[in-house]
Amino acid sequence: MTEDNDEARVPLSDSSTTNDASRTRQRRKRKWDKPAEQLVAAGVAFPQLLPLGNTMNVPSMSPLLQTLSVPLAVPKVNQPKIQDEVIIAREIVINDAEASLRHRLTKRSTQEDIQRSTGAVVITRGKYRPPNAPPDGEKPLYLHISAAAQLQLKETTERILAVDRAAAMIEEMMKQKSISQIGSVGLQTVKMLSTCVYLGFEADPSSNVAARIRGPNDQYINHIMNETGATVVLRGRGSGSLENQHGDEAQLPLHLLLSGSNPKSIDDAKRLAENLMDTISVEFGASRVSSSKVYGAVPPPQQLISGAPGSDQENQNLISTYGLMTSIPITAPPYAVSSFPVTPATSLYPQFPVMQSLGISNGGPSQPVAGGTSYSGYAGIYPQATPLQQVAQVLKQSISPVISTVPPTMLTATSLSIPSDNASNEMERRPPRKRKFQELPADCKVPEKDKQQSELAMTGDVTPSANRVRSPPSPRSVMPPPPPKTIAPPPSKTMSPPSSKSMLPPPPRSKTMSPLSSKSMLPPPPRFTLTTQRSRLQDNHISVKKPNPVPDTLIKLMEYGDDEDDDDDPDEPLTTRS
């Protein structure tokens, strides 16, 4: 029985091994073809096979089920996460935001800053829709915030947080802008500046100038705002803006309204707006007037309103300087200027009066001399010319009829304007002369009149003008030889010269001095006829002009000194002293 049982058991083991081998072969064949159906069939069949025998097939199959079921379950769990990656995005509408904030958020630099700080990508989408504009089927302007896989954000939670942080930053910027606007309006902490740039010409309403100014998709206005940071809005007739059409702006011409808190940004925006308006006017073939010249023009400087800058002040300065440098003012009446023109000129010593000669002023250019210290009046004459040549030159230049045209008022004003202190000042400054014969009234040659004339010329600079008019100067005081015959006009009848019977030859009856003194070489004084001045000078020099008759005993002494006088002429030391 035991053998039979053994024989019976052998076929059972053989059959089990054959069944296992066939099952493994079948499983290997069908695993790659239909894995889902095989697993379902195996999951149902394996529980029935477990109680059949205590073999190792069951433990070997359970890990297989686990290994095969895990890869199939993972795709089912990850499938909704892949769909969430596409949905992780947010949109923030900025179409109704303030213009400056709207353009700040749409700038590429602002969006790049948000991306660097949060990791989310911000993209501008939609189209700007003006207020109260009819819908056109497109979304209004908004920001699309997303977190893409290329940003190295592996987990979904990190991407969601990045999008939330970016949206929070944008919302915070919008809140701060609204708060700043409220503060600027209520508390006036920020002073808003605004200006207008007008089109400058009337365009045809059918030409749609407003669209040309805005540009395609408002690119021109956006460019100005992006470059300067100022707010630019198109307003006025034909602008298409419905915000303030009921107000005063609806009646204004077409213009760009520039506003901002920074003066520099306003200036830059105005410059760009002017260039834009100029370009539009060229396209329409119209001549445009700049906004600064017509609307809201800046007033010109005060210098341009009052005339040339500082012209009156400069003229006053010139007049005052000229008055300081001029030694004597000219106060002659208007009708005296035509007959006797005298031009005041500057002098080296403005504290002394100008001594102007009528003869020189009529014969040649007038050259004033101040105080007897300047020799500019003798340019070209002194000291090359001899005394005789000097006298001849003066006689040629002197013209007596000129005085007849001068009115008496001018003579009186001129004579009174000459100070009497000049003669005394000159006498004090000059050293005393040495005279050979102190007891004689005249220490010169036999003709005492000539000597008296030379003394008068040396001691005083001012003489009566009437004396110059009546008789020309005598050359006797300049040269020892007798005077030329050509310079001896008849003496004046109104004069009373002090003559002596013993004096030979008689000098010309004149009280005038020599026009050119060899001592100081001064220009001759003006020839004015004034009896009051003549009488005053006669009183001052009574001892010189009216000497007592010379007795005969003194004539011999005078003849005795003729020889020595020829050698020692009193005029010589005066010339060397000057």
UniProtKB/Swiss-Prot annotation:
Keyword presence, Transit peptide: no
GO cellular component, one term: nucleus
Single GO MF descriptor: RNA binding
RNA-binding recorded as keyword: yes
UniProt tissue specificity: Expressed in vegetative tissues.
Principal cellular location given in the protein's record: nucleus
KH domain: residues covered: 206-273
Subunit organization: Interacts with AS1.
Protein name: Protein RIK
Gene: RIK
